[in-house]
């Protein structure tokens, strides 16, 4: 049973074609899967600042945080990751820069919602991330 919690924040960005910017996680909880840029909240940070900082670190791009999409809880007792993760995702806009592989990721790419749904069926996108994508367009 998880006895520790981690708070993380992430940012969701979409381009004019409706595609989502995603990163392929190098390690950690979702190693090898496509997710939205994000990471751990550091002491003294606001949730919005954390989401933006992680987005910049992982994609090399900046964005403006527009609104909160939602808060989500993730825990899988079948992994060796013995922490419950509380994640807060934000919708961003005004993307500046060209996406590139940044800290802790092995790839960065744009995907349509249909692509994300298909990748989730193949285990390449966590179910929680599929829900965040869906919630962001509601």
Give residue spans per PLM region.
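Conserved N-terminal beta-strand and adjoining loop/helix that marks the start
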Residues: 1-20
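A generic structural micro-feature
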Residues: 3-5, 33, 80-86, 105
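A structural signal for short, well-ordered beta-strand segments
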Residues: 9-11, 68, 90
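Conserved hydrophobic "DFG−1" position in protein kinase catalytic cores
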Residues: 13-14, 22, 92-94, 110
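Active-site-adjacent beta-strand/loop module that shapes the phosphate/pyrophosphate-binding cleft
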Residues: 15, 73-98
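Conserved Nudix-box catalytic region and its N-terminal flanking loop in Nudix hydrolases
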Residues: 19-57, 61
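Nudix hydrolase/Nudix homology domain
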Residues: 29, 33, 103-138
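A short coil-to-beta-strand element that immediately follows conserved catalytic motifs
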Residues: 62-70
């Amino acid at each position: 049973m998880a006895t520790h919690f981690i708070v993380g924040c992430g940012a969701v960005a979409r381009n004019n074609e409706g595609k989502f910017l995603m990163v392929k996680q190098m390690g950690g909880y979702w190693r090898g899967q496509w997710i939205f840029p994000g990471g751990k909240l550091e002491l003294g940070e606001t949730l919005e600042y954390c989401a933006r900082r992680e987005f910049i670190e992982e994609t090399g791009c900046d964005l403006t945080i527009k609104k909160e999409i939602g808060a989500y809880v993730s825990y899988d007792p079948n992994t060796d990751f013995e922490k419950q993760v509380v994640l807060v995702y934000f919708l961003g806009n005004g993307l500046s820069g060209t996406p590139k592989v940044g800290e802790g990721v092995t790839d960065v790419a744009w995907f349509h919602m249909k692509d994300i749904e298909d990748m989730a069926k193949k285990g390449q996108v966590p179910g929680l991330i599929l829900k965040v994508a869906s919630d962001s367009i509601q």
